[in-house]
């Protein structure tokens, strides 16, 4: 058994130890809660973050979508070799010309693509049907035709040398808009003719 004087001296020590223990517990809980709260305040949850997860982490900025969806586009070019004839005269040597096909494709898909091309534009998958391959550059070439009687003729013809992609709107492909705009005007003319007929009948009766 300890003497009473020692008991009295141990009471302040116990009080100090209890205060330190409480302070340690409070510090631990504050650190724990601060660790949980900070990520929530730094990165608030919103609809955009949820949509990013659904869309594979893509952002909704228009520039980002345009850069990812646009690629260079070019025409599918075909080389043709043919002879020019006019009656009984035929060209001595075959004529080689470029034929522009009716579709535009991304450059990596085109045959003989080596990383560049003339007249390249940007192509979007959504608007692939609106692009058409048309003639871009032409030149005049002279050819000689050999006739059956031994005479020769010289002709000037236009040869395509380059193609380009041209974008067409829906109005270019749909010709029905012109007819629809003209058809509503016809009933108005009939209505005016009826008014004139009714007026003439009134004058005749009077």
From Swiss-Prot:
Which cysteines share a disulfide bond?
A: 75-133, 89-147, 100-163, 104-165
Indicate, by first and last residue, each region the UniProt record lists as having compositional bias (Basic residues): 188-206
Q: Does the keyword DNA damage apply?
A: no
State any single GO MF term: BMP receptor activity
Tell me where on the tree of life, at the top rank, the source sits: Eukaryota
Report one GO cellular component. extracellular space
Residue ranges annotated as compositionally biased, kind Polar residues, are 43-62
**Where are the residues of the annotated region Disordered?**
42-62, 176-206
Identification of the protein by name = Sclerostin domain-containing protein 1
Residue limits of the CTCK domain? 75-170
- Whether Glycoprotein counts among this entry's keywords is yes
